[in-house]
Amino acid sequence: MRFDFFVSKRLNISRNKALELIENEEVLLNGKSFKASFDVKNFLENLKKTQDLNPEDILLTDGLKLDLLSEIYVSRAALKLKNFLEENGIEIKHKNCLDIGSSTGGFVQILLENQALKITALDVGNNQLHLSLRTNEKIILHENTDLRTFKSEEKFELITCDVSFISLINLLYYIDNLALKEIILLFKPQFEVGKNIKRDKKGVLKDDKAILKARMDFEKACAKLGWLLKNTQKSSIKGKEGNVEYFYYYIKN
């Protein structure tokens, strides 16, 4: 059974709506996103080899958990960071964190779930942080605040950054001044390559060479600051328009 058919039946929605949810990576099967053509029946058969599942019906079995991203997280960004942390075994517990570009709070939500000691949330916008996060005493919110003018008497054990419509290279100096050790940056090529690079109608970049050059320039800029690159990998979730994005995990020396 195809994943799109499974989603339409399980959620009692049209096939087109199911496809829309899947293409936007807004529906998860057992915590992960899959393509519309993914074989759910085969997936279930493999689960049965290691788990005692009941009942047998593919649409009723408790072995297949279907979740809508909007019902779990305040934004898609949350799942991006969650997957990256889990895949790299990065420990957040008891760390004083700074989140740059907090927006609705996707990264903030995951830092909280991972028991961060305190989170300073920074954003140039206003009234964006989700209501469920605004009242949390661990969060110190700075709205209408540009990183380049932000002042802090303390430095942060972990800095996360997810920004749009600006190149990360323009922020590295300011991040370096605030960082004690760990830095996790979401690199978005669509905001790094310049305006004249080929894109499709949705805004998805179509120039691999330009993307590679932008990444190399970014990595060189980080290296000049003395940062040690621990890992870089594609985000498990693409940008809203479908652009591939990349996580970078650095240690400040």
UniProtKB/Swiss-Prot annotation:
Temperature dependence: High methylation activity of the 50S ribosomal subunit at 37 degrees Celsius. Loss of activity at 42 degrees Celsius.
Keyword annotations from UniProtKB, A to Z: Methyltransferase, RNA-binding, rRNA processing, S-adenosyl-L-methionine, Transferase, Virulence
Domain S4 RNA-binding, first and last residues per copy: 1-73
Disruption phenotype: Cells lacking this gene have no 2'-O-methylation activity at nucleotide C1920 in 23S rRNA. Impeded motility. Impaired biofilm formation. Cells form clumps which lack the structural roughness seen in the wild-type. The cells are less bulky, but otherwise they have no obvious alteration in dimensions, shape or flagellar structure. Accumulation of 50S ribosomal subunits and reduced amount of functional 70S ribosomes. Reduced adherence to the surface of Caco-2 human intestinal epithelial cells and impaired capacity to invade them.
Domain of life: Bacteria
Record's keyword annotation contains rRNA processing: yes
Gene3D superfamilies: RNA-binding S4 domain, Vaccinia Virus protein VP39
InterPro entries listed in its UniProt record: RNA_MeTrfase_FtsJ_dom, S4_RNA-bd_sf, SAM-dependent_MTases_sf, TlyA
Gene Ontology terms describing biological process: cell motility; cellular response to antibiotic; cytosolic ribosome assembly; rRNA 2'-O-methylation; viral process
Enzyme Commission number(s) of this protein: 2.1.1.226
Molecular function via GO: RNA binding; rRNA methyltransferase activity
Catalytic function, reaction form: cytidine(1920) in 23S rRNA + S-adenosyl-L-methionine = 2'-O-methylcytidine(1920) in 23S rRNA + S-adenosyl-L-homocysteine + H(+)
Family per record: Belongs to the TlyA family.
Its job: Catalyzes the 2'-O-methylation at nucleotide C1920 in 23S rRNA. Enhances motility. Enhances biofilm formation. Involved in the assembly of 70S ribosomes. Involved in virulence by promoting adherence and invasion to host cells. Involved in pathogenicity by modulating secretion of host-protective chemokine interleukin 8 (IL-8). Involved in susceptibility to antibiotic capreomycin.
PANTHER family tied to this protein: BACTERIAL HEMOLYSIN-LIKE PROTEIN
Protein name: 23S rRNA (cytidine-2'-O)-methyltransferase TlyA
